[in-house]
Amino acid sequence: MKLIIFTGLVLFAIVSLIEAQAENEKACLPQYQVCTDAPGNCCSDLVCDCYGRYKCGARIGRNCFCLQKGVIYKRED
């Protein structure tokens, strides 16, 4: 009887550990994906870069995207 209880506890511990590891290994966001609500989820070679949106000089929002580190984007007319 003690062996059955011990085996059950060990299996429960293993399942709990597997579930905890699965939560920590969430998929990262690829390049150009929106990261406004999840700034830390971009893949390792990317950074969550945010830009303010303005209309008539007033800020109306913010957009964030996973972009390459060290790359500067400039507006083209």
Curated annotation (Swiss-Prot):
Keyword check for Amino-acid biosynthesis, yes or no. no
Q: Where is the signal peptide?
A: 1-20
- Propeptide positions, renumbered to this chain? 21-26
Domain of life per record: Eukaryota
Q: Which Pfam family is one of this chain's hits?
A: Toxin_35
Report if keyword ATP-binding is assigned.
no
Tissue specificity annotation: Expressed by the venom gland.
- What InterPro entries does the database record attribute to this sequence? Spider_toxin_CSTX_knottin
Give the UniProt subcellular location, in the record's own words.
Secreted
Q: Which UniProt keywords apply?
A: Disulfide bond, Secreted, Signal, Toxin
Q: What GO cellular component entries does it have?
A: extracellular region
Q: Give the main localization category.
A: secreted
Q: How is it modified after translation?
A: Contains 4 disulfide bonds.
Task: Mention one GO molecular function.
Answer: toxin activity
What the record says about family reads: Belongs to the neurotoxin 19 (CSTX) family. 08 (U8-Lctx) subfamily.
**Under what name is this protein listed?**
U8-lycotoxin-Ls1r
Organism equals: Lycosa singoriensis (Wolf spider)
